[in-house]
Regions:
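Conserved short "hinge" loops at termini or chain/domain junctions
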Residues: 1-77, 91-99, 103-188
Length: 188
């Protein structure tokens, strides 16, 4: 009798993960594989949506990736890589065993403490959020190639800058309350 096993389809391969993640070449990548599918589900799928995610997975599983979707995978890779390390880092530091949670140490190295892990995770998350914003900008600019992508906030694409016009309004840290604009008032 054959076992039913769930095999998630991840959007990036090991080469793309190594290329875009902050881990060193001598890191055992297989330890991050479980966190790859978790990060994909938690952070990438909400950005690209279920329909586009399913299309990418189907094309990856049948090895029929379109050039446009191949470009999208390359844009997804840095975001997914950073979020994967963000998700997996605590479990590289500590291990859950039958006797409890233990911190990994060896004769040649000493683990960092929980404060250091928290700081590293903060840096990883900050970088991942910037990369996620760049992914959304890419999807906005190339929207005609991704008809299955339906952003939850239609106004998000309004603020996307085109190359050479990356100007940003001044933010002083002082908040002046004004009426919220609904998406119906966005001009394209």
């Amino acid at each position: 009798m054959a076992k039913n096993t769930y095999q998630p389809i991840v959007l990036i391969n090991e080469a793309l993960f190594k290329l875009h993640s902050p881990v060193t070449d001598n890191t055992v990548i297989t330890e991050f594989i479980p966190y790859l599918s978790i990060a994909q589900e938690l952070y990438i799928e909400p950005i690209i949506g279920t329909a586009l995610s399913e299309e990418l997975k189907q094309q990856i599983s049948t090895n029929t990736l379109t050039p446009e979707n191949g470009d999208l995978i390359v844009k997804i890779a840095p975001v997914l890589s950073f979020y994967t390390v963000y998700q997996g880092l605590p479990f590289k530091w500590a291990t859950v065993l039958n006797k409890g949670v233990t911190v990994r140490e060896s004769e040649n190295s000493k683990s960092v403490d929980i404060k250091d892990i928290a700081q590293l995770r903060s840096w990883l998350k900050n970088d991942a959020e910037v990369l996620a914003s760049q992914l959304i900008d890419y999807l906005c600019k190339c929207r005609e190639h991704y008809p299955l992508w339906m952003p939850s906030d239609e106004c998000a694409c309004k603020n996307t800058y085109s190359e050479g016009s990356a100007t940003k309004k001044f933010e002083s840290g002082i908040f002046f309350k004004h009426k919220n604009k609904t998406c119906n008032t966005c001009k394209r």
